[in-house]
Amino acid sequence: MSNQHTLLISNLLPVGSNISTWWNFGSMLLSCLFLQTTTGFFLAIHYTANINLAFSSVIHITRDVPYGWIMQNTHAISASAFFICIYIHIARGLYYGSYLNKGVWLTGVALLTTLMATAFFGYVLPWGQMSFWAATVITNLLTAIPYLGTSLTTWLWGGFSINDPTLTRFFALHFILPFLIISLSSIHIIMLHNEGSSNPLGTNSDIDKIPFHPYHSYKDLLMFITLMTMLLLTLSFMPNLFNDPENFSKANPLITPQHIKPEWYFLFAYGILRSIPNKLGGALALTMSIIILTTAPFTHTSYTRSMTFRPLAQTLFWTLIATFITITWAATKPIEPPFLLISQTTAILYFSFFIMNPVLGLVENMMMKYN
């Protein structure tokens, strides 16, 4: 098509013809970002960042503001959809070797970190029981940092405990960070288009490319419609599916919930954190659970980019997925046998993937050499 008219070359974005549905989650993430920014703006108009009024203002939004319940529930459910899409997006990157495009991968990890920070600050804003206690537990981890810890925590809290200044600055951060996410997303996309997408085979796509529109744009549209359908079904029939029952009670510093846990999308990191009995060790493991993703491009040893034709690596990858799900499940349970042992085992298995993957790459190289 492009050969027939040279002017079309500059107008069409050439994309590999064999990229599968796993490549559509990037555009779905963009849809989620747009949805979150829009609904977040309308919620911010009616929200009050004050410890005496925050909980009431959320109730006011859902009860009194026209279509406020749609805005509030869409914002909460889209956050979960955002994380489902981003975890699938990362898993695809690990499976198909997309991390070898270093700039794209590293900006992606920066995006994930910023997104997690934004979601954490957002979870505190309704000022419910679980919001308050999750914020207390997580921010308290800063005290584990030698020398600076206590000063940093006091500075973040704006006092000697989580109070009104904390909520005000968390709201300010929750409002400003999405703009950083938008900026990082732009860099992420620019860097991707600098080299181009990989494909399921892990080969160079230059020999077989088709125009992005209409072929891949309609595929993106289909996935967007699927995403919106799932969101609307959840919104209509199960609006509180991802909410914690504790968060329907106003924050009370005098009553501790029986089991403090963050939102489901942080449970894998939280599970790793509490599987280590030492405070500093747990905080380091929590940080490393995200930062370890940055090692992937530098430890790739296999001759082939993708795991499509690497059965040993595939086994390791699906073990990682099972580990991730198990860690998430175990983190919802109290810290007692057998859940503590399950958390510790899965935490070791999670980090083992990033050590074993390069080792398996070398083993597979040797097997190919001698066959």
From Swiss-Prot:
InterPro entries reported in the protein's UniProt record: Cyt_b/b6_C (IPR005798), Cyt_b/b6_C_sf (IPR036150), Cyt_b/b6_N (IPR005797), Cytb/b6-like_sf (IPR027387), Cytochrome_b (IPR030689), Cytochrome_b_C_euk/bac (IPR048260), Cytochrome_b_N_euk/bac (IPR048259), Di-haem_cyt_TM (IPR016174)
Cofactors (names): heme b
One example of a Gene Ontology biological process annotation: mitochondrial electron transport, ubiquinol to cytochrome c
Location (main, coarse): mitochondrion
Compartment annotation: Mitochondrion inner membrane
Sites where the protein binds a ubiquinone: H193
Co-factor binding comment: Binds 2 heme b groups non-covalently.
Functional description taken from the UniProt entry: Component of the ubiquinol-cytochrome c reductase complex (complex III or cytochrome b-c1 complex) that is part of the mitochondrial respiratory chain. The b-c1 complex mediates electron transfer from ubiquinol to cytochrome c. Contributes to the generation of a proton gradient across the mitochondrial membrane that is then used for ATP synthesis.
Stated family: Belongs to the cytochrome b family.
Assembly notes: The cytochrome bc1 complex contains 3 respiratory subunits (MT-CYB, CYC1 and UQCRFS1), 2 core proteins (UQCRC1 and UQCRC2) and probably 6 low-molecular weight proteins.
Protein name as annotated: Cytochrome b
Organism: Laticauda colubrina
Species lineage: Eukaryota, Metazoa, Chordata, Craniata, Vertebrata
